[in-house]
Amino acid sequence: MSVELNDLGRVHFIGIGGAGMSGIVRIMLARGISVSGSDAKESAGLLELGALGASVHAGHAAQNVAGADTVVISTAIRANNPELEFARTQGLRVLHRSEALAAAMAQDTVVAVAGTHGKTTTTAMIAVLLREAGLDPSFAVGGTVPALGVNAAHGAGGIFVAEADESDGSFLNYRPQIAVVTNAEPDHLDHYGTAEAVMEAFQSFIGLIPADGLLVACTDDDGALALAKQAAARGTRVVTYGRSAAAEVWLINDGAHRAIEFITPIGPQRLVLELQVPGEHNALNALAAFAVALELGVEAEQALSALAGFTGAARRFEFKGQVRGIRVFDDYAHHPTEVRAALTAARTVADGHHVLVLFQPHLFSRTHEFAAEFAAALSLADSIMVLDVYPAREDPIPGVTGELITEANAKLTFQPDRAKAIQELVARTANGDIVLTVGAGDVTEAGAAILDALATPAQEVSHGG
C-alpha cells in the first residue's frame, strides 16, 4: 500500500514507545501530523513523545484509538490487540510501521540501507556524514546515534536516510533512489523459510531502484556481489566497495594504516581512512557511507573527516564502563557472522589481553538453525558464558535452549542463571581484559551488573556514555 503522508489524517501508533515506532513519530510530529499512541506501560520514552506533542496512553484499550484515521502497527503487535481489533472493526486504514515510514519518505530522495549485518552502523554513518556536510537529511536508524542524540529526526534537506529491515520483508515497502546492500546471508528463516527466499527478497529490493538510481554493494560478500551483478545486468548503475582491487571504492590495509582508493574523473585517488570504531567490518561500513556521500555531492576529504569523528551507534560495540583496568562493552550481534565480527574487533581492542563474553541467543529458530556456527564464532573469545534463548516474538521449540550452542564446543559454558554467569565470568577477569555482552535481547542490561561485580569499595566505576 503506497500512501502520501498528508493523506493519513490523525495517526495512532500501537506500541508507540518501540525504537522503530518512536522514530517515525518524531518525524511525523515535526512534519505537522497529528499523532496519538499507546504502549504497554509508562516509560521515559513515552513521556518524551508526549512532551513533543503526541497524545500518549499507557496500556492498550479500544478507546485510545478514538478519532484516529490511520493506525500503525509493527510485526510485534498481535492480532488480538484490543486497539487493532477496534481499528479493523471500524474500517480504519491499518499500516505496517514500514508503510508509515515509506509515507514519511515519499517526497524525499531516499537512501535505504539493507543487509543482513551492518545496517544500523552504516545508516548512522551516512546520516552523520550528510549532516556534517550541511545537507540536513531526515533519518531513521535502528539504534540511537550518540552524535545525533536520537535514532530518527526530520531534516529540511530533501534527503531521507533509512535503515531497511529485511527481517519480515518490510524493506520492500521503500522506494530507494540509492540502495545500499552491505551483505546478504540467510537469516530470519522463521519468516522466509529458506535461504533461497531470503535472496529472492533482496533481489526484489534492488528491483525497486529506479532507472536513474544507484546500488552500492559490497564485493566482499558473495550475496551482495551476486546482487550487484544482477543489477548491472539489467542496467542499474552500481558502485562496489570492498577489500578487492576490483571494487570501485577500495579498502587498503597495509598494516600501518588504512586507506581508501576510489575513482574520480581524473583517475584513481587515495586518501587515509581513520576511524574510531574498531573492526574491519566497520571499515567496510565506512566505505559504503563514503560512496553514498560522493554520490550526493560531498567532497571526499569532508566525508573522511566526518567518518573520523564517528563514535558509533547504540549497542554496536558500545563502551559501558571500566573497573580495575577491565573494560566492558555491549554489542547487538545476533547472527554468527556478526558475532565473529564483534569478537574480531574485541581481539584488536584487547591488544593481547583476554576477551570474555556473555552471550544470549536470540530466537529459538535462529538458535536451532545456527547452533554450530554460533559455537565456532564464539570460540574466538577466551572465556564464554552462554545464557538461555531470548524468545522475543517466538514460542519455544522443544529441545532448543542455549545449551544447544555449548554442546558444539567444550570451550563454551551454558549457564541460564544470569547472576551466576556474571559471577563466573567476572571471577576469570584480569587487568586489561575486555568483557563483552552480546545479543539482541535484554543481555544489554547485564553491563551494569558486570561493572558492579567488578567494582570494590576502594575503586570507582568509570561508566561509558
Curated annotation (Swiss-Prot):
Gene Ontology CC, one term: cytoplasm
Subcellular localization, as worded in the UniProt entry: Cytoplasm
Alphabetical list of InterPro entries matching this protein: Mur-like_cat_sf, Mur_ligase_C, Mur_ligase_C_dom_sf, Mur_ligase_cen, Mur_ligase_N, MurCDEF_pg_biosynth, UDP-N-AcMur_Ala_ligase_MurC
GO biological process: cell division; cell wall organization; peptidoglycan biosynthetic process; regulation of cell shape
Major enzyme class: ligase
Catalytic reactions of this protein: UDP-N-acetyl-alpha-D-muramate + L-alanine + ATP = UDP-N-acetyl-alpha-D-muramoyl-L-alanine + ADP + phosphate + H(+)
Pfam families: Mur_ligase, Mur_ligase_C, Mur_ligase_M
EC number(s) given by UniProt: 6.3.2.8
UniProt GO molecular function: ATP binding; UDP-N-acetylmuramate-L-alanine ligase activity
Gene3D superfamilies registered for this protein in UniProt: Mur ligase, C-terminal domain, Mur-like, catalytic domain, NAD(P)-binding Rossmann-like Domain
Positions contributing to ATP binding: G115, T116, H117, G118, K119, T120, T121
Assigned protein family: Belongs to the MurCDEF family.
PANTHER family the UniProt entry points to: UDP-N-ACETYLMURAMATE--L-ALANINE LIGASE (PTHR43445:SF3), UDP-N-ACETYLMURAMATE--L-ALANINE LIGASE-RELATED (PTHR43445)
Protein name: UDP-N-acetylmuramate--L-alanine ligase
Lineage, highest ranks first: Bacteria, Bacillati, Actinomycetota, Actinomycetes, Micrococcales
